[in-house]
Amino acid sequence: MKKLFFLLLSFFIFFGCQKTTTPPNILFIMSDDHAYQAISAYGHGLNETPNIDRIAKEGALFKKGFVTNSICAPSRAVMLTGKHSFINGKVDNIQDYNWDQDNFAKQLQTVGYQTAMVGKIHLRGLPQGFDYSAVLPGQGHYYNPDFLIDGIKKRIEGYVTTITTKLSLDWLK
């Protein structure tokens, strides 16, 4: 009887201890052309950014970042690919970007993540590696902008930051 009890106890302990962790959520926010003191999480008082501060406190706050290419589209290509501009081929804001190359979103998809890109991308072509995309073609407009939503052009009434925030939150839900 003791052997049976020990066997059953071992069985429940073994199967009760299985790994049940889920991968962490990743929210990557990239902003253009702001000074280091524009986000209050970095300890400067220029702007109060309580929501970004909360995200930084609960997640990660990068305090030592280095830019390999500080030009708009090339910097995005570097972020997507992890490769210097002279390797990923996007060295200026004019030439096309090769979406066929590997990027971090494609890698995240291979391990089960759902991926989305919302906002200004400034890379020609349709984003690849994303389950959902709502991007501004080119520079975009601040009011009543056209978006490419999963490749379909749609004009949305309103201010671009408000629209981008809403599209992002709708997808996250």
Which residue ranges define each predicted feature?
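Formylglycine-dependent sulfatase
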Residues: 2-4, 17-173
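Sec-dependent N-terminal signal peptides
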Residues: 4-14
